[in-house]
């Protein structure tokens, strides 16, 4: 029961993080809107163009910048909570139905992100 509630909380926060990441990419492109409320008015096509513009202007982008999105403080704290409750990536893999191929992209993204975090920062077992 607690695990299901925790999974719902994680899904809600992952959606929030995705929206915040898009807003950060929009503001990082150097073409900031005059009003903070205008961020919601930027279409997905406009966001894509802003991202492309920031990549062209920025120069060299290494893999650490791409991976920086999984080490945000909110995700890090959520993954620590999941690890503290004993939820392993394999548990998510089974519970979310990823092994059956019926899971949507959000579940796959959550699983892969948590799996990478768990491999890097999760509890170490030496036996």
Swiss-Prot record:
Induction of expression: Expression is induced during host plant infection.
Keyword Signal on entry: yes
Residues spanning the signal sequence: 1-19
A single Gene Ontology CC term: host cell
Residues spanned by motif RxLR-dEER: 48-67
Keyword entries, A-Z: Secreted, Signal, Virulence
Chief localization: secreted
Keyword Signal recorded: yes
Localization: Secreted; Host cell
Function: Effector that is involved in host plant infection. Contributes to virulence during the early infection stage, by inhibiting plant defense responses induced by both PAMP-triggered immunity (PTI) and effector-triggered immunity (ETI).
Domain-level remarks: The RxLR-dEER motif acts to carry the protein into the host cell cytoplasm through binding to cell surface phosphatidylinositol-3-phosphate.
Similarity comment: family membership: Belongs to the RxLR effector family.
Protein name: RxLR effector protein CRE6
Species name: Phytophthora infestans (strain T30-4)
Gene: CRE6
């Amino acid at each position: 029961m607690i695990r299901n509630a925790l999974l719902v909380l994680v899904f809600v926060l992952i959606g929030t993080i995705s929206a915040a990441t898009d807003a950060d990419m929009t503001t990082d492109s150097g073409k900031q809107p005059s009003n903070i409320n205008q961020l919601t008015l930027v279409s997905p096509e406009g966001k894509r163009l802003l991202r492309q513009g920031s990549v062209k202007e920025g120069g060299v982008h290494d893999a650490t910048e791409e991976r920086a999105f999984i080490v945000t403080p909110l995700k890090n704290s959520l993954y620590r909570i999941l690890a503290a409750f004993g939820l392993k990536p394999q548990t998510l893999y089974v519970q979310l139905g990823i092994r059956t191929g019926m899971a949507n992209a959000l579940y796959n993204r959550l699983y892969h992100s948590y799996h990478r975090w768990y491999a890097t920062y999760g509890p170490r077992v030496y036996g």
